[in-house]
Amino acid sequence: MPDSIKKELTRPYGFLFTNNDIFINFILEKKNNRLITVGDVVTSTLYDRNIIPFLSIIDGKTKRQIKVKTVNENVIKVKNEKSTIRFSVMKIIKNLLDKNERATILVDGEEDLLVIPVVIFGRNNDIIVYGQPNAGAVVIINNHFVKIRVKQILEKFYVKKC
């Protein structure tokens, strides 16, 4: 990932929730939509309220040392280095979302950037949640315009062999 994109990716690309109760209430109002989480803290926060995401992407590491249990029976282990989106991981995300298959993806490495393929391959109206460090939870209601913006960001990445 080029350094020029790092600053751009530090801003939230959806609704930023700093209050867990308001965040949970918002998610519960959208219970008929597929819920996808990227990040240990947001996933754990939802698990603690018995809200099980359709797809969770976690790496088992967080600044707050929260241990996230996996509740989906389908756990897929992948490797994804820092500042990287592996093509193989993108394919797995695409296949799971296309097949409407519940799963937890456990990342050896870093999961932060995997929001990008989730948005690109997700359906319109999917609820995508990711953690905003030192701020709260960001919720994206996926749509055509978000997909266009995320594709523009992805186009700035460069391809290299892992």
UniProtKB/Swiss-Prot annotation:
Translocase found in the keyword field: no
Molecular-function GO term, any one: kinase activity
Pfam families xrefs: DUF359 (PF04019)
EC number: 2.7.1.237
S-S bridge residues: none
Enzyme class: transferase
Keywords: Coenzyme A biosynthesis, GTP-binding, Kinase, Nucleotide-binding, Transferase
Recorded metabolic or biological pathway in which this protein acts: Cofactor biosynthesis; coenzyme A biosynthesis
InterPro entries: GTP-dep_dephospho-CoA_kin (IPR007164)
Binding site for GTP: D40, V41, V42, D59, K61, E111
Reaction equation(s) it catalyzes: 3'-dephospho-CoA + GTP = GDP + CoA + H(+)
Record's keyword annotation contains Transferase: yes
Superkingdom: Archaea
One Gene Ontology term from the biological process aspect of the record: coenzyme A biosynthetic process
Similarity comment: family membership: Belongs to the GTP-dependent DPCK family.
HAMAP family per record: Dephospho_CoA_kinase_GTP_dep
Function: Catalyzes the GTP-dependent phosphorylation of the 3'-hydroxyl group of dephosphocoenzyme A to form coenzyme A (CoA).
Name assigned to this protein: GTP-dependent dephospho-CoA kinase
Organism of derivation: Sulfurisphaera tokodaii (strain DSM 16993 / JCM 10545 / NBRC 100140 / 7)
